Amino acid sequence: MSSIIRSTTILPANRAAITIHTEDELNLVGEVASPKGARVASILCLHPLPTHGGMMDSHILRKAAFRLPELAGIEVIRFNTRGTTSEQGTSQGTFDFGVCEKYDVEAAIEYAFSEAKVERLWVVGWSFGTDLALKYARDPRIEGLILLSPPLRSSEPEDLLFWAADGRPITALVPEFDEFLKPAEAIVRFSAIPQIEIIAVEGAKHLWVGEPSVYRVLNEITLKVSPRKYPLPTEWSEVN
């Protein structure tokens, strides 16, 4: 018998708490949720602004960890940047407005490859996390970026020019009613990156509240990272 996948649904995965060690000697708390079956690819999630409640458990990232390992074979790596608290605990250090978070992002990427032994890694940033991705997720082993509600608040022109020259794929999901950067403006401000795909999401807002928005985001991630599992089902049966 199948059950409808709801906001509270937690599907099977191998879940483990992790500690990420930064170059400036901080310990960051996190979690890896891995498929019980074959791992197709992995995503590293960079959360929204912690001074406005952003953390590794921000709802889109939490639901990605609850669903994508089972439904799409996608391993989900989440962590709290310095000074950020969630149910998993508090990462050491103090919020640094996206400056020393460079060390957090670089350490998380290295953890993914050295400890989690990922083979295909995409970076998924949401809001503040999109600026971190554009500025610091430059490791050549990364396959591409997926940006959710990018505000382009701290990304500099040279960051965009780096990605333009680099050529790796970038997808930006921009809500129709985003409070910080709407689709038309996003097209202009991202124009320096010729390969970027900007997807205007009708009816959505910056925080992606509601199951239709969640489903759309997770589907778009799946299409890029594990396309054979697209589209995601809306129901799940324990006997698959």
Residue ranges and their predicted role:
Residues M1-A41:
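N-terminal cap/lid segment of alpha/beta-hydrolase-fold proteins
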Residues G125-A133:
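Gly/Ala-rich beta-loop-alpha elbow adjacent to hydrolase catalytic centers
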Residues R153-S154, E176-L181, H206-L207:
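Acidic catalytic loop of the alpha/beta-hydrolase fold
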Residues E158-L160, L181-S191, S213:
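Short alpha-helix in the alpha/beta-hydrolase fold that links the catalytic acid
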Residues D166-G167, A172-V174, D178:
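Short beta-strand/loop motif that positions the catalytic acidic residue
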Residues S191-L207:
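Catalytic histidine neighborhood in serine/cysteine hydrolases
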Residues A204-R216:
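Catalytic histidine-centered segment of alpha/beta-hydrolase-like enzymes
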